Amino acid sequence: MNATDLLNHPYYDRFKDILSDPTNAWIERIQDAGKIEEGLVTMYNGLKVYKDCYYDNFSDIFWLNGGVHEPQEEFVFHHILRGIKNPMPTILELGSYWAFYSMAFMQKFPLGKAFCVESDPNFMAQGQRNFALNGFEADFTCGFVGNNGIKVDDFCAEKGIERLDILHSDIQSFELEMLYGAQKMISEERIDNIFISTHTQELHYACLKFICDNNYNLVVSIDMNESYCCDGIIVAQSRKVNHTPYNVARKGQRALWTDEQMIAHLEAKKNPLI
């Protein structure tokens, strides 16, 4: 990839947002983070993924940004993992696609359990491949989450899940329906940590109200105008958890990188695609 390729990349504007995020400087990366070898990319935490596993060439952000694709969310997720004391915790990832967050969870907790739900069978296959690549196991379900599909309360009952250490949801505008379908688990505080990607401002604040109305403590709320990752982000914790709010960087607090800075960053990389 040269400068012209970068400037004409279909995801260039997204890449500029991500690379401009000051949160990048706060994420600890292993030495080989972003390295491509034999069609695999090393993520910031050492996980391996297939280099085109996430929206094809959007995956270029993996090597451009040292194995990080959503700095704000990944930073908070990493610190939430560090706060989990249960040696055998459980994660439910809704909209799992390439299953990165579930893999990061299993990397931290080898005795844990991961349940992954994805509506697109082709996307789900990417997550299954990545899980197998890293030697992890998960319970994969292909299905739609929402009022007319899978409901968290019913899913947990069917799978025998008594409590969730993490509920992670990125389901493309069905997040409020997801919360309604998790009402029992949430009201009984059987979900310790909730991560929600939001896809409109209206949904963001509706989800935020639901979370607060159910007496969860807010860890971070980043609406779509403040996000470097395109989606809004809500992270909340049960009152049973030692609450730790995070003050992450927000878009608009500083200027985005210029084209010249983007090109300089590209040239500074040991570009694995040349």
Question: Where do the language-model regions lie?
Answer:
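Short, conserved loop/helix-junction motifs that constitute active-site signature segments
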Residues: 108-109, 184-191
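S-adenosyl-L-methionine
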Residues: 1-117, 120-161, 218, ...
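A short acidic, amphipathic alpha-helical/loop segment
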Residues: 104, 154-155, 178-185, 206-210
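Conserved S-adenosyl-L-methionine
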Residues: 95-98, 168-172
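Glycine-rich phosphate-binding loop signature in dinucleotide/nucleotide-binding domains
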Residues: 83-87, 156-164, 188
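Short acidic, Gly/Ser-rich segments with clustered Asp/Glu that frequently serve as metal-coordination loops
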Residues: 172-178
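Conserved beta-strand signature within the Rossmann-like core of class I S-adenosyl-L-methionine
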Residues: 190-199
